[in-house]
């Protein structure tokens, strides 16, 4: 990651660069500026912020923006990863490499630890994605984090679409949409009572396409699973899932090799791959530009549990 790069870029034929505005700033420049402002606002308002960092593309772009926000000084926040134990090996290897290269402090909250001590129980379907809330809230309370940066975007899902950039969480970590504060212009209110904290979403106004165009412009390295590759998968619920001891395949589900890539990265047991030949950033940008499905709608089994699955989890303290 190079925090020194950036600027106004004219639109290229491959669609990987933002369109210039009359005042000289591209669409990506405006999004970047907004995110940088949010990072600096949090640094000024809060005492112990932390950045959620899983090694997924949104958290990678978020970290890149944090680097730009404070360069040449180091990022003044720690990183936090809630580890389900069902991670893609390529993503964990990338996470560790980035943390070591940047010399940042990474706190890991392990779902397995809470299963081992009896606080959590394995789900019948094998997925651990919904189990992340308890380790997340425990880490926030134990380290006394008062602001938590997340990579959520409003285009991903309807519950995230209505959440504010500064999202107040109560003393139990829960989100109440009725307590949301107005955010006029670029004025953000970080006031909170003891025991409460604020989730902050610097990428709220970005889309999946914006993220990939920014990755192209800034030449940001991503884990290889975001690009087309050969992988063993099986079909379930209209999605291609990776085989594993925790989630399948079940009886009647056949494993086959396909050329796929991942649009989003989460728990292996509930994150689906999509058929794809997109092997480069430009290929991915072109593919997303013509897609009619959101990344979570196409690839996340945990969001299909009910119409309000994401909102229900967020009310309990989820990301």
Curated annotation (Swiss-Prot):
Catalytic reaction list: sulfate + ATP + H(+) = adenosine 5'-phosphosulfate + diphosphate
Broad EC category: transferase
Pathway in which this enzyme or protein is active: Antibiotic biosynthesis; mitomycin C biosynthesis
Q: Which GO terms describe its biological process?
A: antibiotic biosynthetic process; hydrogen sulfide biosynthetic process; sulfate assimilation
InterPro entries the record matches:
PAPS_reduct_dom, Rossmann-like_a/b/a_fold, SO4_adenylTrfase_ssu, Sulfate_adenylyltrnsfr_sub2
* Transcription as UniProt keyword: no
- Tell me its EC number(s), please: 2.7.7.4
Question: Example GO molecular function term?
Answer: sulfate adenylyltransferase (ATP) activity
- Keyword field contains Cell wall biogenesis/degradation: no
Spell out the Pfam families in the cross-references.
Answer: PAPS_reduct
Domain of life the protein comes from: Bacteria
Q: Which UniProt keywords apply?
A: Antibiotic biosynthesis, ATP-binding, Nucleotide-binding, Nucleotidyltransferase, Transferase
Q: Where is the segment annotated Disordered?
A: 1-22, 296-319
Q: Which family does it belong to?
A: Belongs to the PAPS reductase family. CysD subfamily.
According to its UniProt entry, the function of this protein is described as:
With CysN forms the ATP sulfurylase (ATPS) that catalyzes the adenylation of sulfate producing adenosine 5'-phosphosulfate (APS) and diphosphate, the first enzymatic step in sulfur assimilation pathway. APS synthesis involves the formation of a high-energy phosphoric-sulfuric acid anhydride bond driven by GTP hydrolysis by CysN coupled to ATP hydrolysis by CysD.
Name the NCBIfam families for this protein: CysD, PRK05253.1, PRK12563.1
What name goes with this protein? Sulfate adenylyltransferase subunit 2
**What does UniProt list as this organism's lineage?**
Bacteria, Bacillati, Actinomycetota, Actinomycetes, Kitasatosporales
- Gene that encodes the chain: mmcV
